[in-house]
Amino acid sequence: MRRILFVALSVMFLAGCPSLPPEQPEPPTPVVPVTPSEKPTPPSEKVPEPPKMSAIDWESTVQPLVEQLVKAHGLENAKLLLVDTVKNNTNGALQTMQATDALRQAISSEHVFELIPQNQVQNARQSLGLSEEDSLGLRSKAIGLARYLNAEYVLYSIVSGNSDKRDIVMQLMLVKTGEILWSGHGDVK
């Protein structure tokens, strides 16, 4: 009996609740097109041009260092030399291949070392999985490459600094021991 009474009271209570009438949606307001009174003007400032890469005279930069190198004490003539790619540790872009070529030409003109041909170096780099523009150019990689090519010496070069003042550092290393036999530095012109 209680159940019936409870159900009856619930029905009466729920029937007595006012139901909300459904709301009528408001009609959309018409869109009035507005004609622009002024045409937008483009900004008057020009976009600045990126800085142009300055030409570096690599021949005059590396020649004094090569002259110091060939006069270094304790070097044997006609030994096989690997000229490793010049590394760029500056905050800008450099033509490292042009620098490496200028370095190779300056060394070959002195007739002190026998240079490993560039195509042999490129083939060895590919065999060892080294990139030509390897940004992580380490001395150990240069010595490993020189050992692979059976070179007696390796010339490791780094250009560092910023766009205003750059320096080049060269190190001649004995491949067998990794000993630095000669080190020189100069300004990049």
From Swiss-Prot:
Name of the coding gene: lpoB
Has UniProt tagged this entry with the keyword Lipoprotein? yes
Coiled-coil annotated spans? none
Extract the Pfam families matched here. LpoB (PF13036)
* Segment forming the signal sequence: 1-16
Q: Where in the cell is it found?
A: Cell outer membrane
Indicate where a lipid (S-diacylglycerol cysteine) is covalently linked. C17
User: Keyword Membrane, does the record have it?
Assistant: yes
Q: What does this protein do?
A: Regulator of peptidoglycan synthesis that is essential for the function of penicillin-binding protein 1B (PBP1b).
Question: Residues bearing covalent lipid (N-palmitoyl cysteine)?
Answer: C17
The biological processes this protein is annotated with in GO are: peptidoglycan biosynthetic process; regulation of cell shape
Q: Which HAMAP family match?
A: LpoB (MF_01889)
- Family statement: Belongs to the LpoB family.
Look up and give the organism this protein is from.
Photorhabdus laumondii subsp. laumondii (strain DSM 15139 / CIP 105565 / TT01) (Photorhabdus luminescens subsp. laumondii)
Q: What is this protein called?
A: Penicillin-binding protein activator LpoB
